Amino acid sequence: MRATPGRRSFLATCGLAAAAMARPLAAYGQAVDNARQASRPSQLQITDIKCAYVRGSLFVKIHTNQGIWGCGEGVDAVGGTYHLVQTLGNRIRGQNPLNVHRLFEQLRKGSIFGGAQAGMFVAVLTAVETALWDLAGKALNVPVYQLLGGKFRDKIRVYLDTALYQTRLPTPDQFAAAASKAVKDGYTAIKFDLDQAADPNKYDSFNWTASPAEVQRMVDQLSAARQAVGPNVDICADMHGRYDYPTALQVARRLEPLNLMWLEEPIPAENIDAYKLIADATSTPICAGENVYLAHGFRGLLEKGALDIIMPDLQKTGGLGEGQRIANLAHLYYVPFAPHMVASFLGAMASSHVCASVPNFLILEWQTY
């Protein structure tokens, strides 16, 4: 085809625009390459650590003497953790950030009497540890999964958390519609919340026992979702640890015909024996772990066979190295690893490196809200 003058000028304009856009991208890429080439790993030192609290997550950025930096995220770390981040930063300033396990153990062991076993401290430590892995990958010019020992897979399967947790009680039809939309969008697994705060059939806000009508509502909602998508889509249900043993057992048994992928946190995380009783009494797989911290926290659950699937949150349980330890511990008991994930895209990508690096990975949570 012969180009007309108008067509020539249009193509020329497009070419100039593309070149103009390519220049800054090329410059950025060159800057990254220069930083990597200039990296002297054995001489790296931590010079500063900064943090910000954005949309419910703590973000930590670690700086070095070579201009290389790393970012990490911690969830459920609360907004007033600035001073804790600075305290941890002061302890590792001047050290080589590539010694990730050593620095993690130094910070954890140095705060045993200050809450280093669980909760907010571990969530903050998680953000710091993840930032160290990010920094190490940049300094050595390799993906973090490579630093964790390499990958078992090239793709990470995710399920969609439908987030039907509203001020108004979702109907079974809304569950069905959400399930159908998720499948249409390409998901092969979906999750629904069953602990609906707006349910008028609750006994009261402090009662952990569900009323018969509340249990029936849960069954009706999930039955509608299953009917909408058929038998070949995985469906998960989350109770957020807000019920007691009798309710959990009743719900698990009532849901058996729906062939769920799992029932998540039907009771609070603390009582291992109660989880064992539920898991032994139903064919519905029982899953928990988002409120369990460090590999030590999962040891008892696995030793007693209290869970069918473990679900650590890699942005609060201790970080990527600790997450891999938890997965490998579960692998010894032939228990699948399905990480909880309510973090930002940064946390999601960090979790994906661990998911790639362990053999017993099942599926990762994905948020769209």
Predicted regions and their residues:
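N-terminal secretory signal peptides and thylakoid transit peptides that target proteins
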Residues: 1-18
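Shared catalytic-loop signature of beta/alpha-barrel
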Residues: 82-83, 90, 95, 102, ...
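Metal-dependent enolase-superfamily TIM-barrel catalytic cores that perform enediolate-based chemistry
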Residues: 155, 160-276
